[in-house]
Structures are given as C-alpha cells and as structure tokens.
C-alpha cells in the first residue's frame, strides 16, 4: 500500500514516512534514546536530499512572503513544516499556500531568524519541536 502512496508523492517527500514512524515511536516512548533516534532519522533524510512542506502566509504591505508559524502554549513561535500533504491537511484550518523546501536549507534558514525558537514538524499530529540547539 505504501508503494501506491509513493507513486503519487513528490520525490523529495518519499521516505519522510520514516520520520513520521520515528516521531510516533518517540511519542510512545519519550526517552533520550528515542529522541536521538528520531533526530538521526531526520538527519538521514536531510543527507538524502529530502524535503519538507512549508506553508506560506500571504504577503502584507511589504509584499514579502512569510513562512507559516505556530505559537505554542508557552508563547514561543516556531516555523511550521510538514513531512507530507496529509500531515499539512490535518490542521483543519483554511487551505494554505505551500511549497517544498530542502530540509538542509530549512534548518540553515531557521538559524538566521532570531524571532523563532526553531521548527515544529507536523504540528497537528506526529509532532516534534526541533529547537535551535538541535538544528
């Protein structure tokens, strides 16, 4: 069944289900070992030239696109990224504009923006927050 899913999936997203599985395992068993495993899976996808989906907010007066953000309960702001379109659609909000970005480039860009804590991957379901220290 997953083979059919990959046929209709962007090439850069193929393999991201490994990240989703690692996050699910981390949610079941929140240990340092599982966190290290999950971060290793994400790094491996980065080395494989994997991609994430970013939502973009419409331009305001300055005509600049802004990467979609999520504000967590503690008031911190995170860039929202998704492993696949299914995860992005789980937000239930309005349909957003999206684009694909290389995982590596996303992490490098996040380090340049002081207004965010890092990247929240799949904020609606299989979630992991990757803070600047782990980027």
Question: At which residue positions do the language-model features occur?
Answer:
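An interfacial alpha-helical scaffold signature
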Residues: 1-132
């Amino acid at each position: 069944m997953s083979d059919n899913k990959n046929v209709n999936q962007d090439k850069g997203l193929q393999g991201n289900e490994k990240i989703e599985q690692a996050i699910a395992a981390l949610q079941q068993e929140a240990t340092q070992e599982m966190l290290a495993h999950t971060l290793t899976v994400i790094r491996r996808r980065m080395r494989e030239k994997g991609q994430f989906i970013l939502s973009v907010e419409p331009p305001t007066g300055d005509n600049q696109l802004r990467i979609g953000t999520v504000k967590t309960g503690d008031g911190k702001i995170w860039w929202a990224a998704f492993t696949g379109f299914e995860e992005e659609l789980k937000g239930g909000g309005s349909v957003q504009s999206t684009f694909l970005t290389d995982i590596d480039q996303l992490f490098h860009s996040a380090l340049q923006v002081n207004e965010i804590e890092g990247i929240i991957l799949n904020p609606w379901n299989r979630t992991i927050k990757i803070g600047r220290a782990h980027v």
